[in-house]
């Protein structure tokens, strides 16, 4: 591997006027403490030329009912403390991605920030659809509490929409694997 960046760290900040709750899917054991994001002494991952990283979040938009958003009664003996962070109302930004990395021969990191506006799922790439199908399959295999109403048929249908970039046949092999798992489950 030819390293192009070392100590690569990613931090996602969701806009509370758009998102009431979120959950990182996978990577639970690789979470970085907030204070370690800016700490150049804290080791993180390396990125090689041509490599990419994908992280999936389950997002509950503001105003959407969810069984996974905890509703807590007001406290009787304590006053509700005003949160330090206030939602940015009026902003169409869904989140901001913060990326920190060091060049291979440097010891001081650089930070990039990129806001993301929700496009309501329009123009989703086939790579994203395929990765989402793989993530859904993982939730089914683990029988995750968060799998919701997901089915093997949905995984297959989503993956089939993402077969256009499959020169080596890996995506078709994934489909066969899901079909086999579905057959074993029945």
Predicted feature descriptions by range:
Residues 65-178, 184-186:
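Conserved functional hotspot residues or short segments at active or partner-binding sites
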Residues 1-91:
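Acidic, polar loop-rich interaction surfaces within structured domains
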């Amino acid at each position: 591997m030819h390293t192009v960046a070392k100590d690569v760290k990613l931090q996602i900040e969701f806009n509370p006027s758009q998102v009431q709750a979120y959950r990182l899917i996978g990577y639970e054991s690789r979470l970085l403490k907030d204070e370690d994001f800016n700490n150049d002494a804290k080791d993180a991952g390396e990125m090689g030329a041509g490599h990419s990283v994908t992280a999936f979040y389950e997002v509950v938009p503001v105003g959407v009912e969810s069984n996974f958003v905890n509703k807590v009664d007001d406290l009787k003996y304590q006053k509700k403390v005003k949160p330090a962070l206030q939602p940015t109302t009026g902003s169409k930004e869904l989140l901001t991605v913060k990326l920190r990395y060091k060049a291979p021969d440097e010891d001081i990191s650089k930070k990039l920030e990129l806001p993301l506006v929700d496009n309501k799922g329009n123009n989703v790439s086939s790579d994203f659809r395929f990765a989402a199908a793989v993530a859904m399959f993982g939730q089914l295999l683990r029988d995750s509490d968060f799998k919701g109403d997901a089915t093997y048929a949905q995984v297959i249908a989503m993956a089939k929409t993402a077969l256009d970039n499959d020169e080596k046949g890996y995506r078709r092999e994934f489909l066969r694997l899901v079909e086999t798992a579905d057959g074993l489950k029945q």
